[in-house]
């Protein structure tokens, strides 16, 4: 990818996702009309953000850094409250812009803060992790965690632009790059099988942050999300397909007190969802088995604690897709054919979890659909 690629998200307020290398300089042009700019970022990229702040200041913009905790520690009401206080102190009004720098967690909290400050101010996302690029920065969903669960408090607040500078991937720790690949693989299974073919053909290239394979994977995964978001901004039905693998994943994250990387949990969740669909008679063996094979090629986890099902069911009960106590899972009816499985029998869930862990089946508890 030599020239920047612009992917249009045709939502209620259309915007571009610009994908390329060496793009941070474009941010100045995007923000020229901003009264005040708040650069929300995680500690690990302070030097980069300070350089951006200096460039904005040189262009005559009133820009301020707002540092928030890394990863899921940054997605709390206390952190959002801190950000609101800073926005008040720097005088960010309705002509101001919030800019997020970092991974998915920073994107979430910055989007949430922007969406609630003065009932909504502009936000521009500059994701610097693979997960942020292909998932969190696109679509306008923003939320924070509470003791009740992950992302249960949030808003829909679309960005005015997303700037995906692939050069930032070159500074990522390898385990973070690997974790982000789970969302890329998810996009392959729900909509674009070419993603899976590219990974299978060159798994090392898929993890080379400076290579062309990862650039193509990122572009394709972003296009998948842009297409789905354009069809369903508010997650009423179609957009639920983006939660493939996430019902179990969010329960794992909650059980692990958010010490697991989101992508690692999604990887396990994808395998579980495939087993669930296989046992329900909805997914062929080849496609179900392909989940684990592709994820293994990338070094992602594909199993979990065999004794954790009861705790995980508690976490799944508070999943956003659950309705009136009935668990709902996104499953596949074939490659790139996502659907929904509602209220599966507890024995089916237990069997799928057993297939995931390779351990004897546990009793999932309860009966019928009231899991």
Curated annotation (Swiss-Prot):
InterPro entries: Dehydroquinate_synthase, DHQ_synth_AroB, DHQ_synth_fam, DHQS/DOIS_N, DHQS_C. Keywords: Amino-acid biosynthesis, Aromatic amino acid biosynthesis, Cobalt, Cytoplasm, Lyase, Metal-binding, NAD, Nucleotide-binding, Zinc. It catalyses: 7-phospho-2-dehydro-3-deoxy-D-arabino-heptonate = 3-dehydroquinate + phosphate. NAD(+) binds at residues 70-75, 104-108, 128-129, 141, 150. It holds the Pfam family DHQ_synthase. CDD domains: DHQS (cd08195). Binds 1 divalent metal cation per subunit. Can use either Co(2+) or Zn(2+). The keyword rRNA processing does not apply. Its cofactor is Co(2+); Zn(2+); NAD(+). Its EC number is 4.2.3.4. Zn(2+) binds at residues 183, 246, 262. Gene3D superfamilies: 3.40.50.1970, Dehydroquinate synthase-like - alpha domain. Pathway: Metabolic intermediate biosynthesis; chorismate biosynthesis; chorismate from D-erythrose 4-phosphate and phosphoenolpyruvate: step 2/7. GO terms for molecular function: 3-dehydroquinate synthase activity; metal ion binding; nucleotide binding. One of its GO terms (cellular component) is cytoplasm. It is an enzyme of class 4 (lyase). Belongs to the sugar phosphate cyclases superfamily. Dehydroquinate synthase family. Catalyzes the conversion of 3-deoxy-D-arabino-heptulosonate 7-phosphate (DAHP) to dehydroquinate (DHQ). This is 3-dehydroquinate synthase. It comes from Saccharopolyspora erythraea (strain ATCC 11635 / DSM 40517 / JCM 4748 / NBRC 13426 / NCIMB 8594 / NRRL 2338).
